[in-house]
Each structure stands twice: as structure tokens, then as C-alpha cells.
Curated annotation (Swiss-Prot):
UniProt-recorded Gene Ontology molecular function terms: ATP binding; magnesium ion binding; thiamine-phosphate kinase activity
Residues making up the signal peptide according to the UniProt record: none
Binding-site list for Mg(2+) 3: 24, 67, 203
Reactions the enzyme catalyzes: thiamine phosphate + ATP = thiamine diphosphate + ADP
Top enzyme category: transferase
Protein name stated in the entry: Thiamine-monophosphate kinase
Biological process (GO), any one: thiamine diphosphate biosynthetic process
Pathway info: Cofactor biosynthesis; thiamine diphosphate biosynthesis; thiamine diphosphate from thiamine phosphate: step 1/1
Species for this entry: Nitrosopumilus maritimus (strain SCM1)
Gene (UniProt): thiL
Keywords carried by this UniProt record: ATP-binding, Kinase, Magnesium, Metal-binding, Nucleotide-binding, Thiamine biosynthesis, Transferase
Transmembrane segments: none
Length: 310
């Protein structure tokens, strides 16, 4: 690297993240079973225009934290690997390191170490670890279960259309949509507190339609969706494109969960106390696939979420 070499970048991250010494390996202690998740953020596909590098660093942590939230587990430790172009400036490295530090502080994560590389574009890889006796599965839903989602959905898709394609909207809505892209909020506290009531759950970052279809498939049940989890202002912005933003947009970092109806009152109470927005979107029944009920019609909801290499 011409302006900064690897050791200088490592020192910046160590200073920001509180790591004093480098080692060949890292040691940490967890009780119960180890829960792990890794995710990669690539500049060309995952960092939209106007997203700051610190926000991108936080997003790469959030991508993992969101999966922990869906499983009802709090992440405790992490490993971060970074790839920077050789001409990266010190200020950009500082900005990224600060973004990681703030994210780890926000979610209570201790960074153990990582790896540093040089390449054509910025790449962040994050691996997080936690512990739990068990996790909430994707395949546990039963007939007559209620389907809920933390939410609402569609703002991120709207924000991306504003940032990428310069779509216009009301000033207040545009600000809200862009914030959904640059500062997503995984629902960790809600997931941890309520996991005992979930029969199944799954993160929705690849798109709500993907999540619903995967959960229905793994549970060998039919998911009937009779309530779209969006707010009125999204409909005003999206018009005919509303369903695409809500069900296929992706990158919301919310999660879907199913519960026995007897736990509905408790779930709603806990959501209110934690200030977590949740929406009842449907129910589980016998059969297969996902059905969207609208205007007294059953419309198949296909998986059209985000997939790499498609």
C-alpha cells in the first residue's frame, strides 16, 4: 500500500477497537453452545452512493447482528477482516474503524482481531460469536400459528431507489427512507426477550418474500399473508411498485416469526415495552407455499428476493 502499509492500518483498528496486542490466534470463552455467523459487504454491490464508509462498516456488523436477533441470541465477540484499495487515505481508514467501533459498542460486541488485505475495492467481512442452549429454528411453525414481522417494510427499497435512481418523493419520506438504508436497526433485544414464544423465525435481509417462502418450505406448511407490513406513506411514494418494495426489496434487517395465538398478548406487550414495531401479517395452515390474500383473491407470493449470481 502506497500511503498506508498493513501494519499502520492494523494499528488504526487496534486503537479504535481497543485491541492492544496482535496474536496468531485469539482465545475467548463462551458458556453453552457456540453460535456463529459471518457476512461479507462488497463496495460495488453493498455500498450505495452517499453512504459513508463508517455507515458501511456499521452495516457489515448489522448484517450479522440481524441474524442473531432472529435466533434470539445476543452476539458477544467478533472478528473483522478488511480489504482496502492500495491508495486508501488515512481518513477513510479512520472513518471505517470508527464505524466498526461504534457498532460494536452499540451491540455490546468485543472484537478479537481480524485480517487486512489490499485489493481493487473495499470489502468488509464480519464474523460474530455468541452462545445459547438452543436457537429458534426456521422450520418450527405449526398450523394455526400467527405470523408476525418486525418492521415496517419497504423503506429500505424506497431509499435505494432514491439513492441509486434519483427517484423523487416528499422531503420527510426521502429522509426516512435514506435513513433506513444508512442506519438499519436489528431487533436484538426483542428477539432475545421473546425467543421462548417463537415457534420459528428468520432474518429478512434477503427480502420478505424469500424469508416467507423459506420458512414455509422448511416447516412444510402454507403461509397465508393477509396484511402487508407497510405504512401509508410508502404507498404514496411507490404507487404500483409497492409490493415490490415491501416483499422483494431486501436489506431491511428485520425478522419474521411465528407464535402460538395464546402468546399474542404477551408478544404485543413486550414489543410495546421495548418500543419495537411489530405487525401481524398472516397465519400458518396446512399446505405449501405462500399466499397473499387481496381483494378476496389468493395470489401466490413467489420468492423474488435478493440472490447473488442471479
Amino acid at each position: 500500500m502506497s500511503k498506508l502499509d498493513e501494519s499502520e492500518i492494523i494499528k488504526i483498528f487496534q486503537r479504535k477497537l481497543g485491541n492492544k496486542n496482535s496474536e496468531d490466534v485469539e482465545i475467548f470463552k463462551l458458556k453453552q453452545n457456540i453460535i456463529a455467523k459471518t457476512d461479507t459487504l462488497v463496495q460495488s454491490t453493498d455500498i450505495p452512493p452517499k453512504m459513508k464508509l463508517g455507515e458501511a462498516a456499521r452495516k457489515s456488523v448489522v448484517a450479522c447482528v440481524s441474524d442473531f436477533a432472529a435466533k434470539g441470541v445476543k452476539p458477544q465477540y467478533g472478528i473483522i477482516s478488511i480489504n482496502f484499495p492500495s491508495n486508501i487515505s488515512r481518513s477513510k481508514v479512520e472513518e471505517a474503524a470508527t464505524g466498526f467501533r461504534k457498532a460494536c459498542s452499540e451491540f455490546g460486541i468485543s472484537i478479537l482481531g481480524g485480517d487486512t488485505n489490499a485489493g481493487k475495492e473495499i470489502v468488509f467481512n464480519v464474523c460474530l460469536f455468541g452462545s445459547a442452549e438452543k436457537i429458534v429454528p426456521r422450520n418450527g411453525s405449526e398450523s394455526k400459528d400467527l405470523i408476525f414481522a418486525t418492521g415496517p417494510f419497504g423503506y429500505t427499497g424506497a431509499g435505494l431507489s432514491i439513492l441509486l435512481y434519483k427517484k423523487k418523493g416528499k422531503r420527510e419520506f426521502v429522509a426516512k427512507a435514506i435513513k433506513a438504508v444508512t442506519h438499519p436497526k436489528p431487533r436484538v433485544d426483542f428477539g432475545v426477550k421473546n425467543k421462548r414464544y417463537f415457534t420459528s423465525s428468520m432474518d429478512s435481509s434477503d427480502g420478505l418474500s424469500t424469508t416467507l417462502n423459506e420458512m414455509a418450505k422448511q416447516s412444510k406448511k402454507k403461509f397465508v399473508i393477509n396484511n402487508s407490513p407497510h405504512k401509508k406513506d410508502l404507498g404514496e411514494f411507490a404507487k404500483s411498485n409497492q409490493d415490490n418494495l415491501v416483499f422483494h426489496g431486501g436489506e431491511e434487517y428485520e425478522f419474521v416469526f411465528t407464535i402460538n395465538p395464546k402468546h399474542k398478548k404477551t408478544i404485543l406487550k413486550n414489543a410495546k415495552s421495548l418500543r419495537t414495531p411489530i405487525i401481524e401479517i398472516g397465519y400458518v395452515t396446512t399446505g405449501k407455499g405462500v399466499i397473499l390474500q387481496r381483494d378476496n383473491k389468493d395470489i401466490p407470493l413467489k420468492d423474488k428476493g435478493w440472490k447473488h449470481f442471479r
